[in-house]
């Protein structure tokens, strides 16, 4: 599997602008970078939004969950002031807005689908809505990942041409990883950096999978991982890490 090394800006350039906002994604383009990693979930009206958490408390001026909200509610949510006054009024983006931005700029994206907590029906609605939005891409590359491998398997059944990455925490990366990836239909494994060894990276690569590691903020560690055969790293400081 011949894959160019990739540096994914984790939630955009989140040290320079509020995470998972258009401001953070614009910073990526301004720095000449090619890939972002971002997170998607769904509102009550079916709108797919960019947000890491299942509540609004940490990164906005609101609190509580958003599964009962609609697109109209997004106008009242400030996702920037917590980071800095210059970002006051920054909104939670929608996936629709991000796809438009990708088409305009050529930016590529790893879309992490959050493991929706509202049940199977809403999860399937999220999967279908993401597939519909990604179908509007005209040129940029996309990779879809998730910690919920059952969700990824359902996604693959509906969109077999979109490459998938199985996310793993170190504590959940068991010896059956190859069976899981093959059953899901994944092309990539996304392991946590903590405890990752050269031997494990080589095993992943020898089995035919790309290896994108999270979250790596040390340029020296990134270089080591690439030398081991990793195909990508997710980082909060993508502007400080060379791609190869």
Residue spans for each PLM region:
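Phosphate-group recognition and catalysis centered on beta-loop-alpha active-site segments
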Residues: 1-244
């Amino acid at each position: 599997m011949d894959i160019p090394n990739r540096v994914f800006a984790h939630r955009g350039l989140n040290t320079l602008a509020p995470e998972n906002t258009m401001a953070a994604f614009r910073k990526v383009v301004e720095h000449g970078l090619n890939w972002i990693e971002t997170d998607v979930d769904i509102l009550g009206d079916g709108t797919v939004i960019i947000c890491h958490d299942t509540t609004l408390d940490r990164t906005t001026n609101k609190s509580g969950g958003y599964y009962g909200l609609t697109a109209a509610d997004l106008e009242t949510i400030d996702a920037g002031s917590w980071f800095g006054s210059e970002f006051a009024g920054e909104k939670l983006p929608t996936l629709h807005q991000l796809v438009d931005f990708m088409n305009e700029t050529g930016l590529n994206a790893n879309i992490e689908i959050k493991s929706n907590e509202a049940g199977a029906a809403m999860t399937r609605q999220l999967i279908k809505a993401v597939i519909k939005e990604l179908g509007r891409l005209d040129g940029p590359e996309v990779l879809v990942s998730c910690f919920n491998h059952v969700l990824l398997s359902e996604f693959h059944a509906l969109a077999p041409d979109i490459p998938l990455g199985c996310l793993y925490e170190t504590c959940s990366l068991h010896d059956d990883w190859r069976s899981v990836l093959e059953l899901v239909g994944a092309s990539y494994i996304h392991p946590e950096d903590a405890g990752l060894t050269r031997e494990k990276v080589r095993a992943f690569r020898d089995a035919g999978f790309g290896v994108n590691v999270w979250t790596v903020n040390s340029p020296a560690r990134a270089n080591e991982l690439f030398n081991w055969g990793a195909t990508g790293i997710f980082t909060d400081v993508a502007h400080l890490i060379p791609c190869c």
